[in-house]
Amino acid sequence: MPEIIIVKNEAEAGEIYGRCVADLIKAKPDAVLGLATGSSPLAAYQALAKIVKDEAIDVSGVRGFALDEYIGLPLTHPESYHATIHRTVVEPLGLDPAKVHVPGDVLNGTPLEDGDKVALAGPAYDRAIEAAGGIDVQILGIGTDGHVGFNEPGSSLASGTRVKTLAEQTRIDNARFFDNDINQVPTHCITQGIGTIMKARHLVLLAFGAGKAEAIEETVEGGVSAFCPASALQMHPHATIIVDEEAASRLRHKDYYRYAYTHKPAWQGI
């Protein structure tokens, strides 16, 4: 069962994540971070960047692997996840760009039709993560339908990094990054699979707003099912879900989650 932390706002959630990762980097200077895009992690990255600066933490050895990437967008496209990760994580934290990887880096706009090259990129990415020693902390967002990464409902809970077709709802949700024009949103992606994500040593999922309440209810208190990919976190030995009051509004056991978090010993961390 994941630890559930209910916070006032995104800033408080960001502070919790930032402290967790900053302490990790101090203890393990070559830590491997799992990185996600979207709006949910932004406050977390900002909090971490502030701690790194304020405490003069050396991040020169830190490595990173992003969750996913659109297929067909060149790396230079502003909404490619390569560009987004560099804009929101690499530059603010001062990470070495050569040590931060995105699944589509080797594709760089390769069209879906180039099946041989596209199909090989997923297994190669999983091997790269394994060669780095695995991911220490993986940050996650969650879609309104319970997807994590680009693992849409129905994705295998044992899947590795591979090519997926984006659900129409995901394309609608992401159109806000493409001038609200769904026709500009790619139809396919390459994403870490649920099986790949579950190999990370610590998972931290963030969710904010009433629009995520149903997905959080299914993730935390529903059954484990491929139709809510995030529900796989119930099976992870070290998963933390940080939500605001609105995202937690449908949880039946909120009082217990609050009690458990406020009464845990400080040495446990998150």
Swiss-Prot record:
One example of a Gene Ontology biological process annotation: N-acetylglucosamine catabolic process
Alphabetized InterPro entries for the sequence: Glc/Gal-6P_isomerase, Glucosamine6P_isomerase, Glucosamine6P_isomerase_CS, NagB/RpiA_transferase-like
Keyword DNA-binding applies: no
Annotated PROSITE patterns: GLC_GALNAC_ISOMERASE (PS01161)
Coiled coil: none
Keywords assigned: Carbohydrate metabolism, Hydrolase
GO cellular component terms listed in the entry, alphabetical order: cytoplasm
Top-rank taxon: Bacteria
Record-annotated active site: D68, D145, H147, E152
Family label: Belongs to the glucosamine/galactosamine-6-phosphate isomerase family. NagB subfamily.
NCBIfam families: nagB, PRK00443.1-4
Function: Catalyzes the reversible isomerization-deamination of glucosamine 6-phosphate (GlcN6P) to form fructose 6-phosphate (Fru6P) and ammonium ion.
Protein name, per record: Glucosamine-6-phosphate deaminase
The species this protein was found in: Bifidobacterium longum (strain NCC 2705)
